[in-house]
A protein has these predicted regions:
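Short, structured motif recognition centered on aromatic/hydrophobic residues
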Residues: 84-88, 95-101, 170, 174, ...
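Small-residue-rich segments of transmembrane alpha-helices in multi-pass membrane proteins
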Residues: 86-94, 142-156, 198-212, 256-257
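Cytoplasmic-side transmembrane-helix entry/capping segments in multi-pass membrane proteins
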Residues: 80-88, 111-115, 136-147, 171, ...
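The first (N-terminal) embedded transmembrane alpha-helix
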Residues: 54-67, 85-88, 207
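A cytosolic-side transmembrane-helix exit/cap motif
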Residues: 101-109, 133-139, 158-168, 186-196, ...
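Helix-coil boundary and interhelical linker segments in multi-pass alpha-helical membrane proteins
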Residues: 44-52, 99-109, 153-167, 213-224
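Structural signature of hydrophobic alpha-helical transmembrane segments
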Residues: 49-61, 106-120, 164-177
């Protein structure tokens, strides 16, 4: 039996039945299972620790941090404010997710490599922002990838801790969009996901729902996780390429654009 590691941002891991608490009863080596979590097991297909996915998540944190730092620079923040906003944008979604599902310490304060990656993104933008600002389109593409990965990872983590299908979809979407929401709130803006009518949260909802469906049919594997990530990424990129927007409010028989 594989032993779980204290790794708040990983996909679900096997429970170590040999570990015991102070009363001598078996417990998970990393965290206690939530009620109902016994029916949610790793043998449904997700490997316990995939370095590639960890690397991809770190890349997502870095790119999210770049977007936060860029927003801070546009607001004329100092170096401290830039780094703080990079941390918020890169790790805000995971932080919200872990607080909601009771995974402590949250990834935003409990994993030094994630914190360092987000802060490094802030420092990088501080020194190189004239060049990086011209690469906004590329950053937007990477941000779409971060949205896709965080959504699927967040959904699987919710399922692994015993959350129901609806709750797990919500957890996945919050993980995907939470960093951007926190970034916008800290800069005094209405979150983009709420007012720009972009297809941003909708791809996350679709991807999280597909992940739950795969889990419930025992079809979740490394391949299908990758396909779910690709689905969210593809929908977001298509929306960006063809300027697909969510309809605005209905005004006197004319739909808002």
């Amino acid at each position: 039996v594989l032993s779980a590691r204290a790794h708040p941002s990983d996909l679900p891991v096997l429970r170590d039945e040999t570990a015991t608490d102070t009363a001598g009863s078996p417990v998970g080596a990393a965290v206690r299972r939530a009620p109902g979590a016994d029916r949610v097991r790793l043998d449904r297909g997700v490997p316990p620790d995939l370095p590639l996915e960890l690397v991809m998540e770190l890349v997502g944190v870095f790119v999210g941090g770049l977007s936060g730092a860029l927003a801070a620079i546009r607001k004329q923040f100092d170096i401290f404010g830039i780094v703080v906003l990079a941390w918020a944008a890169g790790l805000g979604g995971g932080l919200m997710r872990d607080v909601l599902i009771g995974a402590f310490p949250p990834v935003g304060i409990g994993r030094w490599e994630f914190i360092l990656t987000a802060c490094l993104a802030g420092v990088t933008m501080y020194f190189f922002h004239p060049r990086l600002e011209r690469a906004r389109r590329m950053i937007a593409v990477f941000d779409a990838g971060a949205l896709a990965l965080f959504t699927v990872v967040g959904t699987v983590k919710g399922l692994s801790l015993g959350a129901g299908p609806t709750a797990s979809v919500c957890v996945g979407v919050i993980t995907g969009v939470g960093g951007g929401v926190l970034r916008d709130l800290l800069t005094g803006e209405v979150p983009v996901v709420l007012h720009h009518r972009q297809l941003y949260a909708i791809p996350a909802v679709i991807g999280a729902s597909c992940t739950v469906a795969l889990w419930s049919t025992s079809s979740l594997s490394t391949l299908t996780v990758g396909l779910a990530v690709g689905l969210v990424l593809g929908l977001r990129l298509v929306a960006m390429r063809f300027h697909l927007n969510v309809p605005g409010p209905w005004r006197g028989g004319v739909r808002g654009g």
